[in-house]
Amino acid sequence: MKRIVQTVMLLILFTFHFSLFTSSAQSAFDIIELNRNFAASNYSIYPDTVLPNLTPAPEGKVPFYISHYGRHGSRYIENRRGFDVPYKMLCSADSLNELSEAGQMAMSNMRLIFADTDKHWGDLTSYGQRQLRGIAQRMLERFPEVFSGDAHVDARSTVVPRCILSMGSAMHVMAGMNPQLRISMKASQEDMWYMNHQDPVLRKNAMTPEATKAYNMFIERREHNERLMQLLFVHPDSVRGVVNDIWLNYYLIKMGLFQLNTHLYKQTYLMDIFSSEEIYRLWQWENVWWYIMHGACKLNGAHQPYTQRYLLKKMIEEADSCIQLERPGAQLRFGHETVLLPLTCLIGINGFGLETDNLDELEAKGWWASKVFPMGSNLQFIFYRKDIHDEDVLFKVLLNEIEATLPIPTDVAPYYHWKDFREHYLKKIEAYEELRNDASSKKDQ
């Protein structure tokens, strides 16, 4: 019965996941009203179900190499703050006998979550392992030419345990499907300079005064929830000294949405106490935060995506090298959403290179971070050629296993000419590095 319920959930999730890429008619609110998982942003569940058919390659071209960067699968809440902040507020109100029946129920549900999560903070869940196994299986099934015979699979992970286990889950499936594969796995600080680079200069300058002002103006219309205060407390005004309504609202919604990643996914009380409108407002709040911190936001110079310039350059260089081989196989990298999202923005996949200083434009223009980085999210670069002597190598990008678009010309969409891609993005990276070096030189003068 449990598996049937979970299967139904996944089918529902896939329906709305696929609709994001095939229909522009649905608003973010429409999607959230029907599928609240979408509002979880980077906590949302990966829709690992039946995928749309892929566009056939031009005649004679066959897949021969895959370059990939993927996020770890579903995990537990990363640290205790997400639990302690709202729980301590409810405990303080309870000590004053100010919790309503709904407040008591909320606190009871939080205790269940704590009992399940304690000593597992940030760990990969069994659900997360299944997600990565499914992604790996579909990769082999869709591109068998890349993984035939004793093909080499070079798998690398950041040094975070949930990423290492995600890599292991994927490789276990691949080895089972083709025991001849030559699989190598590595998780080392040696690779962190590009696998999980968080540029301190860019990060420090993300929330400029202009960005902070615009952000605060945007969220002040969305951060309060007086209805929640009326629901959870007998006399809301009596607990305002011990309850911060902004953070109570924020963390309770997040906790309710997060449960979908664990075996407590049927315990939906915390999510059910909120209306779709309230959950939608939180999604708007988080979406603009992700844009400022990782998107090409003009309020801070539009440079945040360049945090992943080392990764993109490394992927280009490794692809250039692998193209020279008869059977290069696949290079798979397992990391984090704080890498995958800015990488997607740096490349400009599906319009995520959007540059604006108007945060109210994001939603209308489709800059929805939730479309990029659910648990298990991934970018797959699939390379095609006729044979090793074919100089016109083509490739396409799959974002979460669905064909994506790039902001460069092509006459074979959704395929692109590799030589065009590498030239465009190496120049883009070089231009930024020159700009940064010039700024550094002027600062030193």
Question: What is each of the regions a protein language model found here?
Answer:
Residues 1-28:
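Bacterial Sec-dependent N-terminal signal peptides
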Residues 26-152, 158-331, 335-445:
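Signature for phosphate-centric chemistry
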